[in-house]
C-alpha cells in the first residue's frame, strides 16, 4: 500500500503596482518542480495595489491568485496579503513583482526556517550578488548605513534591512501583522524593527539583485524621510505582553 506524500505549503506574496512589464517573468521563474521534489508546494498570491495596467490580468492568466488592495501603498498591499494567507500554509514568502529578485532562490530562504534555525529569513542584497545597474552607489550606502544602525540599535543580526525579499514561518507573520501600521515604503523598516522588538529569530541569506523592469515608484526624498522616522520611532516601541506570551507558546510547540 502506497503512502501519500505530505507537502509543506509556501504562500508567496507579490505586492504589485503597475508591474505588467515584469510580473510574467517573475511568475514563470518559480521552481515548482524542484520545490515539489524537496517536499514543498508553492502557491502564489499577487496583491494588485490598484494598478492602472494589466498586472492583475497577466498574473491571473499565469495561474496566480489575485488579491485586490484599493488603497495605494506598498504597506497596505503587504498587510492585505498577510491577512489573506490561509491557515493551511506553513511558510510565507514575499518578493517584489519587478523582477529584481530571483524566485529561483526561494528554497534557500526557506531552508533555515524549515530546519528550525530561525523564524524569519531576510534576503540580503548587500552580501549577495548585485547585477550592474541594480542599485546606485548612493542607495547602496544608504542601505548599508540603515542596516548597520538597526544592528547596533536594535540588536538584531540583519545585513539588508530594506530588502524586499523575506521568508517567514507563518506563525511569525501572525504575530507581526497586528503591529504593522505603515502604508508605504517604510514597511520593510517597520517589519524588521518590530520583529526585532518581538524577539523573532532573524537570519540573513545572500540573494541576487537585478535591475528592475519598469519605472520605480519610490520617491527618494519623501520615502527616505518616512523610513528614517520609522527607524527612530520604533526605538521606543514595545510589544504588548500578550504578544510575547503568544510567541512563547508557538516556540514551545
Question: What does each of the following model-derived ranges do?
Answer:
Residues 19-22, 51, 74, 99-102:
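Donor nucleotide-sugar binding loop of glycosyltransferases
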Amino acid at each position: 500500500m502506497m503512502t501519500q506524500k505530505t507537502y509543506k505549503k509556501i504562500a508567496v506574496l507579490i505586492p504589485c503596482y503597475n508591474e505588467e512589464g515584469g510580473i510574467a517573468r517573475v511568475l514563470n521563474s518559480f521552481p515548482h518542480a524542484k520545490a515539489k521534489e524537496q517536499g514543498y508546494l508553492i502557491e502564489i498570491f499577487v496583491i494588485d495595489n490598484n494598478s492602472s495596467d494589466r498586472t492583475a490580468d497577466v498574473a491571473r492568466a499565469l495561474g496566480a491568485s489575485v488579491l485586490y488592495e484599493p488603497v495605494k501603498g506598498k504597506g497596505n498591499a503587504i498587510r492585505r496579503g498577510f491577512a489573506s494567507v490561509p491557515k493551511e500554509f506553513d511558510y510565507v514568502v514575499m518578493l517584489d513583482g519587478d523582477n529584481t529578485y530571483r524566485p529561483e532562490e526561494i528554497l534557500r530562504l526557506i531552508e533555515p526556517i524549515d530546519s528550525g534555525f530561525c523564524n524569519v529569513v531576510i534576503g540580503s542584497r548587500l552580501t549577495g550578488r548585485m547585477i550592474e545597474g541594480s542599485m546606485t552607489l548612493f542607495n547602496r550606502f544608504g542601505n548599508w548605513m540603515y542596516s548597520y544602525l538597526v544592528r547596533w540599535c536594535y540588536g538584531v543580526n540583519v545585513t539588508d534591512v530594506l530588502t524586499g525579499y523575506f521568508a517567514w514561518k507563518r506563525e511569525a507573520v501572525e504575530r507581526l501583522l497586528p503591529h504593522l501600521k505603515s502604508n508605504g515604503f517604510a514597511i520593510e523598516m517597520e517589519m524588521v524593527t518590530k520583529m526585532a522588538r518581538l524577539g523573532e529569530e532573524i537570519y540573513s541569506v545572500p540573494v541576487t539583485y537585478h535591475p528592475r523592469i519598469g519605472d520605480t515608484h519610490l520617491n527618494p526624498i519623501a520615502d527616505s524621510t518616512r523610513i528614517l522616522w520609522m527607524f527612530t520611532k520604533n526605538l521606543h516601541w514595545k510589544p504588548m505582553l500578550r504578544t510575547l506570551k503568544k510567541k512563547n507558546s508557538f516556540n514551545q510547540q
